[in-house]
Amino acid sequence: MPLLDSFTVDHTRMNAPAVRVAKTMQTPKGDTITVFDLRFTAPNKDILSEKGIHTLEHLYAGFMRNHLNGDSVEIIDISPMGCRTGFYMSLIGTPSEQQVADAWIAAMEDVLKVENQNKIPELNEYQCGTAAMHSLDEAKQIAKNILEVGVAVNKNDELALPESMLRELRID
């Protein structure tokens, strides 16, 4: 099985919160799709709470679209990572890491402005697979943490695992 791009970088050296270009690819029509690693917490050191990340999933995608979408960028999807240390964002376009970081900060400010649980989009049993698993307070705490620390940039060339190590770690 081919090694996924996200497993070729050293998670022990990742900064968080931080933006990283995880992958870029061209569509057959020539559009560029960019996948960003939006790392909220340091891998293997901290994780986002279940309810907090779920509530952020409902809020973050809309707020990021408000701040990043434009003539040259359109967000396709923002999804939480299974390890609960952040989100992957796929989009059409090639915004800079700084543009993404600025939108992320603005989105976290928006999270803090949400007045109550009833204002969380699609929080009902018809549109959400686990409607009871939400916490606006936990989402706001995550947002506060991001705003207090700020958002850095992780560069693939600085985090790349050496080929020898990738061979050593490979499971056949």
From Swiss-Prot:
Q: Which InterPro entries match?
A: LuxS_sf, Metalloenz_LuxS/M16, S-ribosylhomocysteinase
Asked if the record carries the keyword Iron, the reply is: yes
Query: Which reaction(s) are listed as its catalytic activity?
Result: S-(5-deoxy-D-ribos-5-yl)-L-homocysteine = (S)-4,5-dihydroxypentane-2,3-dione + L-homocysteine
Signal peptide from the UniProt entry: none
Locate the transmembrane regions by residue number.
Answer: none
Task: Tell me which residues bind Fe cation.
Answer: 54, 58, 128
Cite the cofactor comment. Binds 1 Fe cation per subunit.
Gene3D superfamilies in alphabetical order: S-ribosylhomocysteinase (LuxS)
Read off the SUPFAM superfamilies from this record: LuxS/MPP-like metallohydrolase
One function term, GO molecular function aspect: S-ribosylhomocysteine lyase activity
**What's the superkingdom here?**
Bacteria
Q: Which cofactor does it need?
A: Fe cation
Its Enzyme Commission number(s) read 4.4.1.21
Return the Pfam families for the record: LuxS
UniProt keywords (A-Z) are: Autoinducer synthesis, Iron, Lyase, Metal-binding, Quorum sensing
Gene Ontology biological-process entries: quorum sensing
How this chain assembles, per its entry, is: Homodimer.
Q: Which NCBIfam families match?
A: PRK02260.1-2
HAMAP family the record matches:
LuxS (MF_00091)
What does the function comment of this entry state? Involved in the synthesis of autoinducer 2 (AI-2) which is secreted by bacteria and is used to communicate both the cell density and the metabolic potential of the environment. The regulation of gene expression in response to changes in cell density is called quorum sensing. Catalyzes the transformation of S-ribosylhomocysteine (RHC) to homocysteine (HC) and 4,5-dihydroxy-2,3-pentadione (DPD).
Q: Which family does it belong to?
A: Belongs to the LuxS family.
This protein is called what?
S-ribosylhomocysteine lyase
Organism (species) = Vibrio campbellii (strain ATCC BAA-1116)
Q: Which gene encodes it?
A: luxS
